[in-house]
Regions:
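Non-catalytic alpha-helical scaffolds and adjoining flexible linkers that form interface surfaces
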Residues: 1-168
Length: 168
């Protein structure tokens, strides 16, 4: 049994304050709840370092949070395939798709085959491609990415995320 008794800030980037502090709590809560202790996923810890640097050093770190959430979901195997839809067809920018946590992304016309209580989100193929490529430069892609990552994370953590509740 390992116990942390004391921690000191060793620097390297500014200590998080204000909203950055809550973002840091959120990031660490996701890591704690979605990964097993001492998981050997070095690229995930690289993503954690990158997002913490962004959160501590940038005024607007929304894109960094979305990028980290997507990296976390992808590396843990909880992200849907954004290269192909449920029919094996390539995701096309001009199409609209239905995304749910439980199923593959499908063209919106096929969404009716799912139980109406099955929560999901309609999203353009262009946004899916931007999410897949980590392109969060457009405000619309940031907003849609938030809906997508929140849907997927909430499905994995039905008990909720405490740090998110503090910010609301």
């Amino acid at each position: 049994l390992k116990t942390l008794h004391r921690a000191e800030w060793i620097g390297g980037w500014p200590q998080p304050q204000g909203r950055a502090l809550f973002s840091g709590l959120y990031i660490n809560e996701l890591m704690l709840k979605l990964t097993a202790r001492e998981d050997p996923i070095p690229e995930l810890y690289d993503a954690l370092e990158a997002v913490m640097r962004a959160v501590c050093g940038e005024n607007s770190h929304t894109a960094a949070l979305r990028r980290f959430e997507w990296a976390l979901l992808t590396r843990l195997g909880f992200a849907p395939d954004l290269f192909h839809d449920g029919n094996g067809e390539a995701i096309r920018a001009e199409e609209t798709y239905w995304l749910t946590p439980e199923n593959a992304v499908v063209p919106i016309e096929e969404a009716e085959r799912f139980n109406p209580r099955n929560h999901g989100v309609a999203v353009s193929g262009d946004i899916l491609i931007q999410l897949r490529e980590g392109d969060f430069t457009h405000p619309e892609s940031l907003g849609q990415s938030l809906k997508i990552t929140r849907l997927l994370i909430d499905n994995l953590l039905p008990e909720g995320i405490k740090s998110r509740q503090v910010l609301q």
